[in-house]
Amino acid sequence: MKKIIYLILSNLFIFIIYPIIRFTNKKFYEKKILPSVINSTCNSRPIQYQRKKVVPKAFGIVLEIGIGSGHNLKYYEPSKVTKIYGVDPSNELNKLAKDKASKYSLDVDFIVSSAEEIPLDDNSIDTAVTTFTLCSIPDSQKALNEIYRVLKPSGKLIFSEHGLSPDKFVANIQNGIEFFYPKISGGCHANKDIPNLITNAKFNIDNLETMYLPSRQKFLGYIFCGTANK
């Protein structure tokens, strides 16, 4: 019963309330409502569970794309990680992440930059981590090409992302909401073909798990979780 009520209310907000507020008062929505919506979603139990599955696999010199306010920091294993470069275009979120980094004995260098132009040398990173980030990067393909460039020849990409469902009905919804959903979600696109983007960047996916997140709308909760080699 709780799940049904949640889905009804969340759909009400996604399809009616948020769009009305966003298109009538953009500044208020993006400053007062959107940040708390994103933070709440990123902190939800199903999302945190996915982070916990993949982040501990990181090793050596790590690049985290879209580090945001540092939701992943508590899942890194300090004994396996020598340094983390956290890339995010938001100064405000980087400041929040800095406060968290000191709690977990991690050496983190926060870089305010877009993922499409990573200011790091070629072949300098052991592990790249992306979690629920590619959906909101304007040019995800360019970002993945950049990740490929900075990874060492033995480097690994670790990812957990949501994207295009293989189910036609769900995919039709994902494609159908493109005209408004990115505008109310901070640029998130629900219909990105994550495996295709990764392989187009010349990565070899060696492990891939797919699923629908429990207690979430299927059109926002189809998950691609795995690893890829350079």
Regions from the PLM with identified roles:
Residues 186-202:
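Short alpha-helix
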